């Protein structure tokens, strides 16, 4: 049994790009789908697809993105911030900038998951899920 499914999702992505794997599979949940959707919209992954296995189990297939000239991953670091044992919250004035704006922070707010830039613009704080750069 997995105690932290978000950390499992981020670890699968990290292991995938460290091993230069093109497509990884992640068990489906709504919050994982929203994290993957944000990564896709920000250009960190090439594509994702939700597939049904055996008519009851859902998987998210994620195609990782690599630099076409150097072959290195677009994602340099993916780091879980708020953990089940230690939650990290911030209001909109204290939302951290990741690498001076080059990376993103995914924040869970009352309006759903969003990036740090959108949360600052909407003046909403929340729980810092992870940093990606």
UniProtKB/Swiss-Prot annotation:
Annotated organism of origin: Karelsulcia muelleri (strain GWSS)
Subunit structure: Part of the 30S ribosomal subunit. Contacts proteins S5 and S12.
Similarity-based family: Belongs to the universal ribosomal protein uS8 family.
The keyword Ribonucleoprotein appears for this protein: yes
InterPro entries xref list: Ribosomal_uS8, Ribosomal_uS8_CS, Ribosomal_uS8_sf
Record function comment: One of the primary rRNA binding proteins, it binds directly to 16S rRNA central domain where it helps coordinate assembly of the platform of the 30S subunit.
Gene3D superfamilies cross-referenced by the UniProt entry: 3.30.1370.30, 3.30.1490.10
Disulfide links within the chain: none
Alphabetical GO biological process terms: translation
Identification of the protein by name: Small ribosomal subunit protein uS8
PANTHER family hit by this protein: 40S RIBOSOMAL PROTEIN S15A
Molecular function terms from GO: rRNA binding; structural constituent of ribosome
Sorted UniProt keywords: Ribonucleoprotein, Ribosomal protein, RNA-binding, rRNA-binding
CC per GO annotation: ribonucleoprotein complex; ribosome
């Amino acid at each position: 049994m997995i105690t932290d499914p978000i950390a499992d999702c981020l670890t699968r992505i990290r292991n995938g790009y460290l091993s230069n794997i093109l497509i990884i599979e992640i068990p489906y949940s709504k919050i994982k789908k929203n994290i993957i959707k944000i990564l896709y919209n920000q250009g960190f992954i090439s594509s994702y697809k939700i597939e049904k296995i055996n008519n009851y189990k859902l998987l998210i297939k994620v195609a990782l993105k690599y630099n076409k000239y150097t072959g290195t991953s677009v994602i340099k670091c993916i780091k879980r911030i708020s953990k089940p044992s230690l939650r990290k919250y911030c209001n909109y004035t204290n939302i951290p900038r990741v690498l001076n704006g080059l990376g993103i922070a995914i924040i869970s707010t009352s309006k759903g998951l969003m990036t740090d830039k959108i949360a600052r613009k909407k003046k909403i704080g929340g729980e810092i899920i992870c940093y990606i750069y």
